[in-house]
A protein has these predicted regions:
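Positively charged n-region of N-terminal signal peptides that target proteins for export
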Residues: 1-4
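C-terminal motif of bacterial Sec signal peptides marking the signal peptidase cleavage site
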Residues: 12-15
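Bacterial signal peptide processing site
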Residues: 17-20
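A short beta-strand-turn-helix
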Residues: 33-53
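Short active-site neighborhood of thiol/selenol oxidoreductases, capturing the structured segment around
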Residues: 48-63, 73
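Thiol-based oxidoreductase modules, predominantly thioredoxin-like and allied folds used
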Residues: 82-109
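Non-catalytic, surface beta->alpha helical segment in thiol-disulfide oxidoreductase systems
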Residues: 120-162
Length: 162
């Protein structure tokens, strides 16, 4: 019986571990101890429904603004001893738009009030986009890049963990 218990605990631990994101495609980013871990939209949806606290970053490696924002987010997250869920919006090479991403409709359901409308009148997730979620609710979000990017990320983590 004790062996069965140990085996079950090991299975649970393995099933609960996060997969570190492969950020090697991001130009000029070489931090092997980065804070990013892979997450699917469905996993994110589950965490929000379970009222969890997390930071999620939507982006992709060929996005110029993502290339600029990602190292800043990495540094600020490290300063706050936080990890960041990464959802690669162009994981599949056939995806030509963030709207092609798997479960995009779920993203619109979860974050629609924070998304802008595109030229066709559809809600569009522009990248980079970071959501700071506390107890299942968005407490802060940062879209794109600006001169106060570091300060914006710091504010998001402060609100998330206050």
């Amino acid at each position: 019986m004790k062996k069965i218990w140990i085996i079950l605990c090991c299975i649970l631990l393995v099933g609960c571990t996060s997969t570190k994101s492969d950020m090697s495609q991001y130009e000029n980013f070489h931090d092997e101890n980065h804070v990013f871990y892979d997450m699917t939209v469905k996993e994110l949806q589950s965490k929000i429904q379970n009222k969890e606290t997390l930071t999620v970053y939507f982006g992709f490696s060929k996005c110029p603004s993502c290339i600029e924002a990602m190292p800043v987010l990495n540094d600020v997250a490290k300063e706050n001893h936080a990890e960041v869920a990464y959802i690669n919006t162009r994981k599949n090479a056939a995806w030509q738009s963030n709207m092609d991403m798997k479960d995009y409709d779920v993203v619109v359901n979860l974050f629609g009030q924070y998304l802008q409308y595109d030229d066709n009148g559809k809600k569009h997730l522009y990248t980079p986009h970071v959501f700071f979620i506390k107890d299942g609710d968005v407490v802060y979000e940062v879209e794109g890049v600006n001169e106060q990017l570091k300060e914006n990320y710091e504010k998001g983590f402060a609100l998330e963990y206050e």
